[in-house]
């Protein structure tokens, strides 16, 4: 069974993903974003991209999915630039996997 891919964030940052066939969910409020991420997880989305600005507001929601195989939650910069939250998560996960920070 194929899993779906979604992106959650502000309109200007996520609209371009529509051209790639990714399901786009516009959200700027933390309450909306939390509900959207939880709904997408239940609806069999395998990958959910979330802009760092939204992720910063819904950290506890994202943390609930950290130990689960699906959905994979990947933080991406918005059109306003990066907060380095996504890269820090990658560094932490790589360090857990190999025992040292190789990035």
Swiss-Prot record:
The keyword NAD does not apply. Produces ATP from ADP in the presence of a proton gradient across the membrane. InterPro entries: ATPase_V1-cplx_f_g_su (IPR008218), ATPase_V1-cplx_fsu_bac/arc (IPR022944), ATPase_V1_fsu_sf (IPR036906). Pfam families: ATP-synt_F (PF01990). Disulfide bonds: none annotated. The keyword Methyltransferase does not apply. One of its GO terms (biological process) is proton motive force-driven plasma membrane ATP synthesis. It comes from the Bacteria. It comes from Finegoldia magna (strain ATCC 29328 / DSM 20472 / WAL 2508) (Peptostreptococcus magnus). Belongs to the V-ATPase F subunit family. Keywords: ATP synthesis, Hydrogen ion transport, Ion transport, Transport. One of its GO terms (molecular function) is proton-transporting ATP synthase activity, rotational mechanism. This is V-type ATP synthase subunit F.
